[in-house]
């Protein structure tokens, strides 16, 4: 029964209609359970654009650590009359009060406040004067809120991950296609200066043919996870008590997917995943006599993904271990290699060398930095300096691009298929990790449209 409950929690309850669970240890049976989550989709939200929205009317649901930061990213857009915040929602009145105070400094009209009940967010979704809903709530609410908002005629921009069950990935895709509403995940690392620089070099042919990439979320979160207030109700810590896999895939995988043009000529084929034993988080919990001190999630998860074109991706996840922050950001090509944290670039010589391989010195490195700076950074670098609180400025660039695409009636940089493909790695990693690193095939959320070669929307100048 425990195993059945685990698989249900990862796939979703309806995955089990007509499927025998008696032999779910067998490879074919597990893959059948995954395949049984599939829903009919069309892929028609690729290159989807809606009518121009001269001023985007925005509602924000969730005004904690993340939501309050995203709110601040709207200052420039509001001053330029590109957007207006008209609804603020959180279950804690102190958070809506704080958000209203921030907003009053640079928006003339005050936003309506919703904080009277756990379901007040539905009132925001049902309003007929809102174009876009920003969702920045605990993970378990991301999918139901996104679905409800789309069903009530709203575009959705949701914090990461947009889903952590396969069935929910299918529901989100199907609902976006049915309602013809944008539904995207707010993956800010795709807008970071380093990642955009690498992407531009790839686009210009500096790396040649990409063969391998590595990304990660290596971030010591022990103090925050164990804090009584930082994650309300310690919702994030509870995930580590009951699950084991890669819970936070998208900071590494989002940029990598753009490097490899996933969904635009290539896609994920299969993965295998394993976790180490857990030691660090429980040790930290015991040191402070925390009531929760037993955790299922291993200290480090390693997930390997193979693409249809034969390229490989290594994703790592570790928020338990004391170490400097890193997303790795490794790109290996036939002509160049990049390693992040700190950023280093190697350019291969025209002829193979026996030895003497070394990273570019600072002078040569800086030449590449200047020559291949991404057009988005060139345009927004100065403005983004005023929004350093948004992860150094990349949060602002992300929100700017979102709103301007809606203003101009353009396809968004990140679409629903990107969002669910990147998020689906989490449940698949859990299934593989808990089944002796079994190789698991990826579902196709695009109905085969991924095979069409298309340019990345993020390479457009707007």
Language model regions located:
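Active-site beta-strand termini and strand-to-loop segments that position acidic
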Residues: 303-309, 333
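A short catalytic or substrate-binding loop motif that flags glycine-/basic-rich loops and adjacent residues
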Residues: 250, 294-299, 307-308, 322-323
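C-terminal helical cap and adjacent loop that interface with cofactors, partners, or active-site loops
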Residues: 10, 29-30, 36-46, 69, ...
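ADP-ribose/adenylate-binding Rossmann-like module
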Residues: 153-165
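Predominantly a Rossmann-like dinucleotide-binding segment in NAD(P)-dependent oxidoreductases
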Residues: 62, 67, 178-184, 189-295, ...
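N-terminal glycine-/serine-/threonine-rich beta1-alpha1-beta2 phosphate-ribose binding loop
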Residues: 2-154, 170-182
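Glycine-rich phosphate/pyrophosphate-binding beta-alpha loops
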Residues: 315-325
